[in-house]
Amino acid sequence: MNSKVVIYTDGACAGNPGPGGWGALLKFNDASKEIFGYELDTTNNRMEITAAFEALKILKKSCNVEIYTDSKYLQQGITAWIHNWIKNNWCKSNNEPVKNADLWQKLYAELSKHTIIWKWVKGHANNSGNIAADKLAVQGRETAIEVLKCRG
């Protein structure tokens, strides 16, 4: 029987593009794990996708996963749009390349390892898991800003 894991993800960016961070809260039974990271020059959408990918990547065995995101871009991209993107060789219906295809492909590769339900949650609306993921993403973003300051 697969274990159940609940994941909350978020991304944050100072400017778009600009320094950004991603964060995720993973809950399993009574345990939880917080992860975050950053990129020096990125977009909010890239950070949203990265948060989900990094959270799934650390799961060591097949799990039943509920992923909560406040990003409609992430939720709709991975549950609806991606099927046509794959069919159209990572192009949209207007033949333009899909933005962030590199990250969508990495995230898609993780999907087959788990049974996943994607859920949208309103951001900044008193959802404790979303608030925790947001704080982690902001921590990542602030780390990126500090790294840039140190580089002058």
UniProtKB/Swiss-Prot annotation:
UniProt main location, coarse: cytoplasm
Q: Which EC numbers does the record give?
A: 3.1.26.4
**Stored CDD domains:** RNase_HI_prokaryote_like
Q: Where in the cell is it found?
A: Cytoplasm
Lineage top rank: taxon: Bacteria
Q: Where, in this chain's numbering, is Mg(2+) 2 bound?
A: 10, 134
Indicate the enzyme's highest-level EC class: hydrolase
- Residue ranges of the RNase H type-1 domain? 1-142
Q: Name one GO biological process term.
A: DNA replication, removal of RNA primer
* One annotated GO molecular function: RNA-DNA hybrid ribonuclease activity
Keywords attached to this Swiss-Prot or TrEMBL record, sorted alphabetically, are: Cytoplasm, Endonuclease, Hydrolase, Magnesium, Metal-binding, Nuclease
Q: Where does Mg(2+) 1 bind?
A: 10, 48, 70
Gene3D superfamilies linked: Ribonuclease H-like superfamily/Ribonuclease H (3.30.420.10)
The record's remark on the cofactor is:
Binds 1 Mg(2+) ion per subunit. May bind a second metal ion at a regulatory site, or after substrate binding.
What cofactors does this protein use? Mg(2+)
Q: Which GO terms describe its cellular component?
A: cytoplasm
Q: Which family does it belong to?
A: Belongs to the RNase H family.
Family annotation (PANTHER family): RIBONUCLEASE H1 (PTHR10642:SF26)
Described function: Endonuclease that specifically degrades the RNA of RNA-DNA hybrids.
Name-wise, this protein is Ribonuclease H
Q: Which gene encodes it?
A: rnhA
